[in-house]
A protein has these predicted regions:
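Charged, often low-complexity linker/regulatory segments
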Residues: 1-58
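Surface-exposed cleft-lining segments at the edges of enzyme active sites
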Residues: 37-44, 91-98, 128-138
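Active-site metal-binding core of divalent-cation-utilizing nuclease and nuclease-like domains
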Residues: 69-118
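Active-site ExK catalytic segment of metal-dependent nucleases
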Residues: 107-111, 119-131, 135
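A domain-level signal for the structural core that forms small-molecule/cofactor-binding pockets
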Residues: 121-123, 160-169, 191-194
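Mg2+/Mn2+-dependent nuclease catalytic core
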Residues: 130-154
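Nucleic-acid nuclease catalytic cores
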Residues: 151-180
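Non-catalytic C-terminal interaction segments of nucleic acid-processing enzymes
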Residues: 175-206
Length: 206
């Protein structure tokens, strides 16, 4: 099998997804009659799971375009020791649980089919339609937890590459500058950041 740069393929898929999202949301927003209605609308994406599903469409298109096969994409995976019998990194899953204090669930895994080697890529995502601050949780704190998870996965050799994905439809990033928090943290930990601050939904009410 040829060397697979899953990160590069995911970046290309991300660009295509973002362009498609803005185009479709632009069409949907034509029927909206007020800013309040636009702010409350959750078109296409409701949460991180939806984001991964939509991104997956474009990732598999990239694989087909590049004549690549035997690559798997998995969503919302718990990295439990009992689930990875035969994988070379399996012993490190106990270390991962110890480091993080619990069995982590990752938003996205890209792996070679039927391969016992480390994953090609793991990614965590945040999809914001509103403020992430509630009770004791903050958007900044959630991002930092995701990045710690990715750093630990990478440093333990469970995944070859790690990526953080940040999507916003012109509500949270625009108001609270969470984008810069993610940028600075990803730079510090040498993690690739894929981000999109979609302004299309509210563009008519600038």
């Amino acid at each position: 099998m040829p060397d697979i740069n899953a990160e590069e393929l995911l970046e290309k898929a991300w660009d295509e997804f973002c362009n498609d999202y803005d185009k479709r949301v632009g069409e949907y927003s034509e029927s909206v009659t007020s800013r309040a209605e636009a702010e409350a609308a959750h078109w296409i994406l409701w949460n991180e799971h939806d984001l991964m599903v939509q991104l997956g469409r474009f990732f598999y298109a990239q694989l087909a375009r590049n004549s690549l096969s035997k690559i798997e994409m998995h969503i919302d995976v718990k990295l439990k020791y009992s689930s990875f019998k035969g994988y070379k990194f399996r012993p490190r899953l106990k270390d991962l649980r110890k480091e993080l204090g619990k069995v982590p669930e990752v938003d996205l895994i890209i792996a070679q089919e039927d391969s016992p080697e480390r994953f090609l890529l793991c990614a965590e995502a945040k999809c914001y339609h509103y403020s992430g601050d509630r009770y004791q949780r903050t958007a900044k704190g959630d991002i930092e937890k995701d990045l710690k998870r990715l750093v630990t996965i990478r440093d333990l050799g469970i995944a070859e590459r790690v990526v953080f994905i940040l999507f916003d439809d012109y509500y949270w990033i625009q108001n609270e500058d969470i984008e810069s928090v993610a940028e600075n943290a990803c730079k510090e930990h040498n993690i690739t950041l894929l981000k999109h601050n979609s302004k299309v939904k509210l563009e008519r009410w600038k």
